[in-house]
Curated annotation (Swiss-Prot):
Keywords: Nickel. Belongs to the LarC family. GO terms for molecular function: lyase activity; nickel cation binding. The lineage of its organism: Bacteria, Pseudomonadati, Thermodesulfobacteriota, Desulfuromonadia, Geobacterales. It comes from the Bacteria. This is Putative nickel insertion protein.
């Protein structure tokens, strides 16, 4: 599978994203031909690329030259424009997801329904070209997964159609909900609404780069030239070929010895519903010879704070420990398979090269055991036997 990692050390914008994707191998003429499938007048815009330097780093700059006076388009106008185009279904779906996230953010900022959202800067032809262009490029390159580094917040103020606003702009701040960010960069707008919307809508994960065999690297330049670092977004494209996938997760732990054990089960349910990768209780003999439980939670980076806070509000714990751990995992996916008992969900486990096993889902087996009046173990055996060759 082909994947791409967005290294946003200096930030991200829509035009920077398209520029970096072009460096990864998208022909500019192909991009022009595909963008022409949008129901926009040919005189409304033109695109071009140039090679630039940012703090000694060679990068591509993507330009969209549009008519000076742009109408303030509503979200529904842009959604209809994309749907009416002759672009591929995958490109349409990606572009629609990005604009929907933008509309959600604008609706929250201005306190209106999504259908009433009208875009200013992001409704211009240049932003439409940036977002649809990014979708076209991702489709051309055959990207199956998109992973993104934590994003820099930036600081200061930015001039917008609504006046002078703090960085990140309100819509950008809304788009960053649930995304890991940091403040380890200088002043200025580092993440634009279009850049934030692209990764918020399309990213499969945020954090460290996944294991891959690197195929190409592309650098997309922004319009500004910062004093502290090269203003580029770096995209690393590769093939996900590792037999054992490697990533980093976090372990959250705490010891509990003064809580009604009936509540522990409820706490586990809440943690799993909140996005914990796994939850376990282990018996302990604690100080003063009291029996207790060790709570262990496996968490992704973006769920770390939320899960820790949930432990502190739903239990008697007054503190938690957490630390990163590396892990190696097999690829897994939920699929539906046909059996004599009906269509069932199973977990398909592979090493990217071959299928290793198919594991029936417990909830599916329990449901079928009740519906068919069969022993649970018999349901397991039937599903395992009938899906083995599929």
């Amino acid at each position: 599978m082909r994947i791409v990692y967005f290294d946003c050390f200096a930030g991200i914008a829509g035009d920077m994203t398209v520029a970096a994707l072009i460096e990864l191998g998208v022909p500019i003429d192909y991009l022009r031909e595909e963008l022409a499938k949008l129901p926009l007048p040919l005189s409304a815009y033109s695109i071009s690329v140039e090679q630039v330097q940012r703090k000694g780093i060679a990068a591509t700059r993507f330009h969209v030259r549009a008519e000076e006076h742009q109408p303030h388009r509503h979200y529904t106008d842009i959604a209809a424009m994309i749907e009416q185009s002759t672009l591929s279904d995958r490109v349409k779906e990606m572009a629609q997801r990005v604009f929907f996230r933008l509309a959600e953010a604008e609706a929250r900022v201005h306190g209106v329904e999504i259908g009433h959202v009208h875009f200013h800067e992001v409704g211009g032809v240049d932003s439409i070209v940036d977002i649809v262009g990014a979708a076209i490029c991702l489709d051309y390159l055959g990207i199956g997964e998109l992973h993104v580094s934590p994003l820099p917040l930036g600081s200061g103020f930015v001039e917008t159609a609504h006046g002078r606003l703090p960085v990140p702009a309100p819509a950008t701040a809304e788009l960053l909900r649930g995304i890991p960010v940091h403040g380890d960069v200088g002043p200025g707008e580092r993440v634009t609404p279009t850049g934030a919307a692209i990764v918020a809508a399309l990213a499969d994960s945020f954090g460290r780069a996944p294991a891959m065999r690197v195929v190409a690297v592309g650098c997309g330049a922004g319009s500004k030239d910062f004093d502290d670092m090269p203003n580029v977004v770096r995209l690393v494209m590769g093939e996900k070929t590792a037999i054992l996938l490697k990533d980093e997760i976090y372990v959250i732990e705490t010891h509990i010895d003064d809580m009604n054990p009936e509540i522990l089960g409820f706490l586990m349910e809440r943690l799993l519903a909140c996005g914990a990768l796994d939850v376990a209780f282990s018996p302990l003999q604690m100080k003063k010879n009291r029996p207790g439980s060790k709570l262990t939670i496996l968490s992704s980076f973006d769920k770390l704070d939320e899960l820790a806070r949930l432990v502190l509000t739903e239990s008697t714990a007054i503190g938690v420990r957490y630390y990163p751990v590396a892990r190696m995992i097999l690829s897994r996916a939920m699929e539906e398979r046909d059996t004599s008992l009906g269509r069932v969900k199973v977990k398909v486990v592979s090493d990217e090269a071959q299928l290793l096993r198919i594991v029936p889902e417990f909830e599916e087996c329990r449901r079928l055991a009740r519906e068919k009046g069969l022993p649970l173990m018999e349901v397991y055996r039937i599903i395992e036997r009938e899906t083995a060759g599929q």
